[in-house]
A protein has these predicted regions:
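Charged, gly/pro-rich active-site loop segments
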Residues: 2-5, 75-151
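Short solvent-exposed loop/turn micro-motifs enriched in small/polar/acidic residues
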Residues: 19-21, 33-35, 87, 132-133
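Structural motif corresponding to alpha-helix initiation and N-cap regions
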Residues: 11, 55-56
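Broad gene-expression machinery/nucleic-acid interaction feature
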Residues: 23, 36-38, 67, 91, ...
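Short beta-strand segments
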Residues: 21-54, 70
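Extreme N-terminal tail/first-helix region
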Residues: 1-19
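Helix-adjacent hinge/juxtasegments
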Residues: 51, 57-79, 85
């Protein structure tokens, strides 16, 4: 990282940012081009957990190539200045990479989907079986994390 004074290396701080963020942007490989989608996510230990419909471009790409990159940010604010070129941003961001795995086990899918319920404040309780069956759950095994902050 060019600006070492802005680098976040503390693992606990990186995961605090991940827990605070509500949306991640997941980048995948589509032939010779990147493909990026915004998603809600949950955390299971060190892993990101994503959910989706069982079909679509994202699912096709993940099945072809499970290598992914993701980004989250929190505390983003434009810092206005007297002149346009002096504007800045306040932020904390995490960029990570890893491998996507499809969760096929029904009980594990239900457990991971329950993490979304608790993360986003939906009423607790058993998930409808039809939702567990029709929802695709993807675990991203995080291999690398980097972080950056700007005051």
């Amino acid at each position: 990282m060019r600006r070492k004074e802005q680098e976040i290396t503390d693992r606990d701080e990186l995961y605090r940012i991940l827990r605070a963020a509500r949306v991640c942007r997941l980048a995948m490989v589509d032939g010779d081009r990147p493909y990026l989608v915004p998603l809600t996510f949950a955390l299971d230990g060190d892993d990101l957990v994503l959910h989706s419909a069982r079909a679509g471009r994202k699912i096709e790409l993940l099945r072809r190539n499970p290598a992914v990159c993701f980004e989250v940010e929190e505390g983003v604010e434009v810092m206005q200045a007297e002149t346009a070129c002096d504007f800045s941003m306040r932020f904390r961001t995490v960029i990570g990479s890893g491998e996507a795995e499809f969760v096929e086990d029904r009980a594990e899918r239900a457990r991971l989907l329950a993490l979304f319920v608790s993360r986003f404040g939906a009423p607790a309780g058993p998930l409808p079986e039809v939702e567990v069956q029709r929802t695709c759950v993807v675990r991203v095994r995080v291999r690398e994390l980097t972080g950056k902050r700007s005051p």
